[in-house]
């Protein structure tokens, strides 16, 4: 199983390289249409009541497009946890959440050490999805650094894999319903995080870059439990599916409502949001073409102070140190923990083999489903309430 996972990861890494190369090239074909739509939507939605109605429409049409309408009930679920490790100021466990019958969302749970967590009975919780970064996704050192640092600051952090990446190998990342699977995984990951006894469900945040930023946008739009969100290097004039990975645009979640990425960010108002853009990817002109629209939605709630734009004109498409620092500061202010710089000497970078939930020594449960057809059947069973 380990060999298969490594080979699959290598194939995905190669595909991700091509995806990012395409992502960073010229203007998208739908850019002008998106800008026209924003002008129309802005003229039609000038107060909070109008935005409340629009958000309801966006949620409904997104869920319909993803095959999740009406939103299925999220009942009890099983959680597998193993391989507890303790480091300097934080701990790590390998965790799998059964999100569908026999289908698992895999990840790592980072927690502050009890001595730190004891300062408050409950602390913030933060979801950290990863993007299409070569190689390794959530196993990448910079992703581990982000999660470990936030845990050292007192947050409980759940880092989880995209479908078809790392140890999430029950179907492929180009599965026709991968967008629905990842959205459902995010909802269940949020359920899991909020259920933990040391997490204050009123202080839950989410951040990710690129495809992880898309997941952040989608979940923050759909679920008010995400109290503060920070999508990184992803908000610019685009609408699915042209130019997107299937996990972002493989299902019609934007078309029926004639919406786009920038409107999704605006519809998160009035909850706190940081949108981070850079000069060397398609977000390069977000401060000019996107942020005024997003800010207008927040102003409709008299909450302009709750949305921030950080633009780094000399930086590229990643989640590097300066981007992480901006996100740490934003989350600290809005979720209530102390903001300090990273101290890399206090963070242990683990090997992927340590972080895998499923491996030769920890195999998938016998009831696990395998392949797109079986996963699709499990998805349909969940939707119909079957067991």
Each predicted region: which residue ranges?
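Bacterial N-terminal signal peptides that target proteins for export
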Residues: 2-13
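Bacterial Sec-dependent signal peptides at the C-terminal "C-region" and cleavage site
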Residues: 12-30
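Alpha/beta-hydrolase-fold serine-hydrolase catalytic core, especially in secreted/extracellular enzymes
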Residues: 26-105, 115, 121, 269, ...
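Cap/lid segment of the alpha/beta-hydrolase catalytic domain
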Residues: 116-195, 234-250
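Loop/turn elements at helix/coil->beta-strand transitions in domains of secreted/extracellular proteins
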Residues: 122-124, 153-156, 200-203, 224-228, ...
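Alpha/beta-hydrolase fold nucleophile elbow
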Residues: 198-210
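Glycine-rich nucleophile elbow surrounding the catalytic serine of serine-hydrolase chemistry
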Residues: 208-218
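Mobile cap/lid helix-loop segments that gate and shape the active-site cleft of serine hydrolases
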Residues: 225-271, 278-291, 297-303
